[in-house]
Amino acid sequence: LPKPPGEAGGLNITLYAFSIMKESLEKAVYPGFAAKWKVEHGENVRFTSSYAGSETVTNQILQGVPADIAILSIDRDAQRLKDKGFVTSDWHALPYKGIVNKTPFVILVKGGNPKGIHDFPDLAKPGLKLIHPDPISSGGAQWSILAIYGSELIKSEQHSGEPDQARALQTLHAIWKNVFVTPASAREARTTFELGNGDALVTYELEGLLMKESGKPVEIIVPRATIFSEHPVVVIDRNVSPQKRAVVNAFVQYLWSDEAQQAFVKYHFYSVTNSAFNDANKEFGHIEMPLTIDYFGGWDKAYPEVIEQIFKNKVKSRK
């Protein structure tokens, strides 16, 4: 007969996450939680993980993969899981509205910055080859579009007192004309760039810092104004067995512990609980005008108004 959970075999948590969570989870957060649970409960905890673009992860869960927990790039994906009955608990009632970490959007260029890229509008230079993840499969791609569009809005607002939507649309359109490949996730986009393709990549700052750490000849260009992506955790209630509920809930709460937040900072996410933790990472770039999703009125407005109406209808369809 199979052993009940908690006996010799221990407990297994299945976690699906958007692509850039891999290093921090596997190298620090999982081992930290497993050690804590072992001391407190005498049980072994193992983790089974899968990583892909946030939209892809969400679709996989909707198609029936046995995830207990998901960490997603965008809140809208969590809402999709709730709408289909996979998530019944309210992740916004968790600490920090369910957001476990954040990271700003930047531009990666080749060593020496041969194309002279200093801000988002420079990505519209004629002949430039831009790598950009696919907004259909990647949450990071949607954050990137909001970063570019929002950056132009807030700069024009600072200059004239009014956000210039026409200018923001024009800039986004001109940049998108230079996109020559759209990998399925932020991590696949980084791999494409690492292999020597393209002149620039818009992505999470974390990706650039990991590349630099591994000795790759890359420069990180921090735009004057850019968005911080904020990443929610959700429990896939439909999939969590009663025997696993306690350990799943404990792991979710652990994500806001000092230990986990400092681990995220070590692997180049910003902490959401304590800004002093972020001072430990000397690699973070200075952002003159930081944006959040609140600038757009949250995902409920940002997705239909910017991703659907502006990007899909006015930019992508007219490339």
Question: What are the functions of these language-model segments?
Answer:
Residues 6, 238-319:
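Extracellular/periplasmic juxtamembrane helices and adjacent flexible linkers that interface
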Residues 82-155:
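A conserved helix-loop-strand patch within extracytoplasmic ligand-binding domains
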Residues 1-84, 93-94:
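Early extracytoplasmic/lumenal segment of secretory-pathway proteins
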Residues 106-108, 219, 232-234:
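Residues embedded in well-ordered beta-strands
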